[in-house]
Amino acid sequence: MESTPKKAPRSKFPALLVVALALVALVFVIWRVDSAPSTNDAYASADTIDVVPEVSGRIVELAVTDNQAVKQGDLLFRIDPRPYEANLAKAEASLAALDKQIMLTQRSVDAQQFGADSVNATVEKARAAAKQASDTLRRTEPLLREGFVSAEEVDRARTAQRAAEADLNAVLLQAQSAASAVSGVDALVAQRAAVEADIALTKLHLEMATVRAPFDGRVISLKTSVGQFASAMRPIFTLIDTRHWYVIANFRETDLKNIRSGTPATIRLMSDSGKTFEGKVDSIGYGVLPDDGGLVLGGLPKVSRSINWVRVAQRFPVKIMVDKPDPEMFRIGASAVANLEPQ
């Protein structure tokens, strides 16, 4: 009987090599994920402002369309300036009339001031006369008892003293009248300052009727047209600040230990995943709303009981500034993938 030949034992080296390579690859992937975190839970974003008119009026010119790119200083829209132009003309006319009134009043005041100076001199003269009459009466009255003067002479002295006092009072009233006339110009000058303030405010309102782009951006959410009445402080549309784009990437809290402000990043947008953009970490979020607890009632946190032994890492937003964004690709809310390279 012929004996069957024994099969040669298979070598285990290739299988061991494959297992070893798989382990090495697994270790590399784990190290890479831990040292260079990546996430596809990210989106592009930019700062926005609501474009609001600061004055009310009907829109007479709308220089932009929805989703249009604009440059700083470009005209966005114009509100009917005619009411503000009329207010400005009215205020300027009031100022001109007030200037004429001040000029005429000043002439009158100058004349009254000259008269007031004359009255002041008359006051001093009347005061001296009244003093002299009082002194004469004071000297004459004792002489009547001695018989050196007659009663008639004393009466004349009293009459002279009373007349001098009356003259003095009349002159004092004239002086007060002249002083009040001078103060009337001060009131007109103050009124002129108020009119000038009205003119400045009206010019500002007229300037505000023309709204221009405060920075390079893109118009969105435009839902109005010429003829619409615009109310002050009510948004007309939104303007995206396209000068600075950034990506909000939500990383697991276990990935945050090596992430710092300035950490280099590589960004890809899903609209064109073959193109990459460089960036740097700007900041890391310090607060998110938890999904399953933390409700505060009466000052004490209410924590729900849990029998779930699997803990899912919380994600925190990381803001990544993009160095040279493509203005045609970046849109607010665009899906992105972020890869970080901690140093």
UniProtKB/Swiss-Prot annotation:
Provide GO CC annotations from the record: plasma membrane
Kindly list the GO molecular function terms attached to this UniProt entry: xenobiotic transmembrane transporter activity
- GO biological process: what's one of them? xenobiotic detoxification by transmembrane export across the plasma membrane
- Species source reads Escherichia coli O6:H1 (strain CFT073 / ATCC 700928 / UPEC)
Q: Does the keyword Membrane apply?
A: yes
Q: Which residues lie on this side of the membrane: Cytoplasmic?
A: 1-12
Q: What is this protein called?
A: Multidrug resistance protein MdtN
- PANTHER family, per this entry? MULTIDRUG RESISTANCE PROTEIN MDTN, P-HYDROXYBENZOIC ACID EFFLUX PUMP SUBUNIT AAEA-RELATED
Its membrane topology is listed as: Single-pass type II membrane protein
The family database entries (NCBIfam families) matched by this protein are listed as: 8a0101, PRK10476.1
